[in-house]
């Protein structure tokens, strides 16, 4: 059970870091390409 909890925590932390990293890297890239998305 403890191992499962650790694995779940690692997966959640990985996704959170991935989301934050992607958001930070996409934030400046979206400003100039804002017209492209519209």
UniProtKB/Swiss-Prot annotation:
- What UniProt keywords are attached to this protein's entry? Membrane, Photosynthesis, Photosystem II, Reaction center, Thylakoid, Transmembrane, Transmembrane helix
Please give the start and end residues of each transmembrane region. 4-24
Q: Name one Pfam family in it.
A: PsbI
Q: How does it sit in the membrane?
A: Single-pass membrane protein
Matches recorded under InterPro entries:
PSII_PsbI, PSII_PsbI_sf
Q: Which GO terms describe its biological process?
A: photosynthesis
The main location is membrane
GO cellular component assignments:
photosystem II reaction center; plasma membrane-derived thylakoid membrane
Cystine pairs: none
Q: Where in the cell is it found?
A: Cellular thylakoid membrane
* Functional description taken from the UniProt entry: One of the components of the core complex of photosystem II (PSII), required for its stability and/or assembly. PSII is a light-driven water:plastoquinone oxidoreductase that uses light energy to abstract electrons from H(2)O, generating O(2) and a proton gradient subsequently used for ATP formation. It consists of a core antenna complex that captures photons, and an electron transfer chain that converts photonic excitation into a charge separation.
Subunit structure and binding partners: PSII is composed of 1 copy each of membrane proteins PsbA, PsbB, PsbC, PsbD, PsbE, PsbF, PsbH, PsbI, PsbJ, PsbK, PsbL, PsbM, PsbT, PsbX, PsbY, PsbZ, Psb30/Ycf12, peripheral proteins PsbO, CyanoQ (PsbQ), PsbU, PsbV and a large number of cofactors. It forms dimeric complexes.
Record family assignment: Belongs to the PsbI family.
The protein in question is named: Photosystem II reaction center protein I
Q: Which organism is it from?
A: Trichodesmium erythraeum (strain IMS101)
């Amino acid at each position: 059970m403890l191992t499962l909890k650790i694995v779940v925590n690692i997966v959640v932390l990985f996704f959170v870091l991935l989301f934050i990293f992607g958001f930070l890297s996409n934030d400046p890239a979206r400003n100039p390409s804002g017209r492209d998305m519209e």
